[in-house]
């Protein structure tokens, strides 16, 4: 029988006897915490429940717009998410590529289904963002323990993003997208819907067409052409069971009474998107792009989006995907490089960041100041805050007080080569690659709840 030797309790007193000058700075005192006597932090009484929102306008289908009204049945809105049933898709045997034709959904399918979404109070837009922001927010904020589940939620699964020919089928599937509106960031900035009787609160959505989401590719020469309804067994597909949900919190009568009578300022985050710029590595290897934002900017997202094929979404690299061995879609990680070599951020003709390599924005910045490091190539961020995930002010720059802010990029060598095209079938740049430069920002702003309405005291 194996014997187990332990330690005498007396030996622990030897550790305690080493208390000296340095320990006086580390331990003890009136404010010291006793780790073996837990203090309970009480909260006000509440309950929460999921609520399905009612559509008030439009049609929730491909290439359509629609909106939903936020219910006032609860007191606070904690978060929101959208669900959709993606239809089964089957390629015709006599499609335009015949036996060589394959179809698959683009990466980040549910991100890219949302062309644009906004939160509106009557006609005042409080927040608005596009699918590109969903890509970047997930890349830099999604911790590893949730990333696999999140990919399942938005359609990044083998059965959806790997090619099938006319003998197979893309399955019908229910997808879920958490919507990162400002009120979902923390329960402390939950939307006090019960205190806004004079505002109609709406969530609006503009959805992409299926032709911008479904990749139709030749499995031998990797040619990509736009899909049409005539290529599909069931014709033009339609979305099913599109639903928008929120989590409502219900509080006590006393707290509800105070909500309606006490003015309140809420520090929130908003998203700004700069106009997109054409990125031309062959003719302009060191482009300079103006950045025009306002308010207290805490975080910049930027990258070069590959726009060669309309249906190939969420591609921020120098190459287009190919099909290997006539069966597997590949992003060619060894060929599909970052289009950006380095970036200089300029304030009023002075370099704020001078020729910092792309790895600084893709790896170093998110390692120290982000929520996670992107797995995919081509994502960049610069964070003025000490922690991009913290709602409290921890650093920002007021772009409204700056003039002539710009980003100067140095194009990577592979971006120059691939922009010329002419590669082999499996090169990823058989066609000349086209690009556009994207810049987004997250800023602090203040929402004021007063007299039953929402407004911005600082516009």
UniProtKB/Swiss-Prot annotation:
Family affiliation: Belongs to the NCLDV major capsid protein family.
Assembly, per entry: Homotrimer.
Keywords: Capsid protein, Late protein, Virion
GO MF annotation list: structural molecule activity
Pfam families per record: Capsid_N, Capsid_NCLDV
UniProt subcellular location: Virion
Highest taxon in the source lineage: Viruses
Record carries keyword Ubl conjugation: no
Function according to Swiss-Prot or TrEMBL: Major capsid protein that self assembles to form an icosahedral capsid. Represents around 50% of the total virion protein mass.
Transmembrane segments annotated in the record for this chain: none
Protein's UniProt name: Major capsid protein
One GO CC term on file: viral capsid
InterPro entries registered for this protein in UniProt: Capsid_N, MCP_C, MCP_C_sf, VP_dsDNA_II
Broad class of the protein's primary localization: virion
């Amino acid at each position: 029988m194996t014997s187990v030797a332990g330690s005498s309790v007396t030996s622990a007193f030897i550790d305690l006897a080493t208390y000296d000058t340095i320990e006086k700075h580390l331990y003890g005192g009136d404010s010291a915490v006793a780790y073996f006597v837990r203090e309970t932090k009480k909260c006000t009484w509440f309950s929460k429940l999921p609520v399905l929102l009612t559509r008030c306008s439009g049609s929730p289908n491909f290439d359509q717009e629609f909106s939903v009204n936020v219910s006032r049945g609860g007191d606070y809105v904690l978060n929101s998410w959208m669900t959709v049933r993606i239809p089964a898709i089957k390629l015709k045997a006599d499609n335009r590529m015949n036996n060589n034709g394959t179809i698959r959904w683009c990466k980040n399918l549910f991100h890219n289904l949302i062309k644009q979404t906004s939160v509106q109070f009557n006609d005042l837009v409080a927040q608005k963002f596009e699918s590109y922001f969903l890509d970047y927010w997930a890349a830099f904020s999604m911790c590893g323990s949730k990333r696999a589940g999140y990919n399942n939620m938005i359609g990044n699964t083998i059965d959806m993003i790997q090619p099938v020919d006319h003998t197979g089928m893309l399955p019908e599937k229910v997808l879920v997208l958490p919507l990162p509106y400002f009120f979902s960031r923390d329960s402390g900035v939950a939307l006090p819907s019960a205190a806004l009787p004079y505002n109609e609160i709406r969530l609006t959505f503009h959805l992409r067409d299926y032709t911008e989401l479904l990749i139709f590719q030749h499995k031998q020469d990797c040619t990509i052409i736009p899909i049409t309804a005539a290529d599909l067994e069931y014709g033009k597909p339609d979305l099913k069971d599109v639903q928008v949900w929120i989590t409502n919190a219900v509080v006590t009568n006393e707290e509800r009474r105070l909500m309606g009578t006490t003015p309140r300022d809420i520090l929130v985050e908003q998203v700004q998107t700069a106009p997109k710029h054409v990125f031309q590595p062959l003719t302009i290897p060191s482009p300079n792009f103006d950045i025009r934002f306002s308010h207290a900017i805490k975080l910049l997202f930027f990258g070069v989006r590959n726009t060669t094929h309309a249906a190939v979404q969420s591609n921020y690299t120098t190459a287009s995907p190919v099909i290997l061995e006539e069966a597997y879609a590949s992003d060619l990680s060894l060929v599909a490089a970052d289009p950006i070599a380095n970036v200089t951020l300029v304030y009023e003709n002075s370099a704020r960041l001078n020729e910092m390599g792309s790895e600084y924005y893709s790896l170093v910045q998110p390692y120290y100041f982000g929520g996670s490091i992107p797995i995919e190539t081509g994502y960049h961020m610069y964070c003025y805050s000490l922690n991009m995930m913290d709602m409290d002010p921890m650093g920002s720059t007021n772009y409204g007080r700056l003039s002539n802010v710009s980003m100067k990029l140095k194009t990577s060598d592979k971006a120059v080569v691939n922009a010329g095209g002419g590669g082999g079938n499996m090169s990823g740049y058989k066609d000349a690659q086209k690009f556009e430069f994207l810049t987004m920002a997250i800023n602090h702003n203040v929402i004021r709840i007063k007299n039953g309405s929402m407004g911005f005291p600082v516009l």
